[in-house]
Amino acid sequence: IFTIAIFVIGGIFGYKKIVSDEREKKIIQMFNKDVLNSFVENKKSVIERLKTSNKEEADKIYNEYLETNQLILENINTEHLDFLNNIYNKDSKYYFTEKDWKTANKFLNNYDLEIFDLAETEVSIIEVPNYYYNIFKDYVTDDYREYLEITSKENEELYYTDGSILVSYNKIADGLLTWENFLKKYPNSDLAEKANEECNTYRRIYILGSYNSPTREGELY
């Protein structure tokens, strides 16, 4: 009887492993490898350019790459639109459990990408948080390096959406202080305008709240 029990239990675990492996294959097959590879190849070409550039040239390469990379990401998201729009739809073949989500991101991490929940069921494929920092940190000027370091940390956690504030007000205040210090340190930086926009966003959220959840009752802006 003991032997039979072991055999049955082993069979159950074996079956679950087969089902799990099949599900993993189906998830990976949902992705268009060609558009993902184009993202990787573009990154490789940029890294080669950086190896022979000075710091000011590297700053320009970053700005160019940021623009072209957004177009590639738009294409990636368009290619996977049906999939992304139905991740939360339990009646869809694209519906993801928490385990499915982890499986998909484990695969996408090979391309330095991840599926990110922008909150309120809006889902996109984006770069991993430290993507640009890791590529450019050893090549760009000090202000660009620090800017990328700040944004990489911010990208690790969504602070707010139109519907709600997702972190404590202390974190909002810390974010504002970080950008104010950046502007004091690099007042003439090419990135000063972007940093100032970040400051204004943090100020607005801290004082007024998010668009759909203002801190002043009845006051939307």
Range-by-range predicted roles:
Residues 97, 101, 125, 129, ...:
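Solvent-exposed, acidic/flexible segments
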Residues 134-142, 182-194:
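Short solvent-exposed coil/turn linkers within tandem alpha-helical repeat scaffolds
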Residues 172-185:
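Amphipathic alpha-helices of TPR/Sel1-like and other helical repeat/solenoid scaffolds
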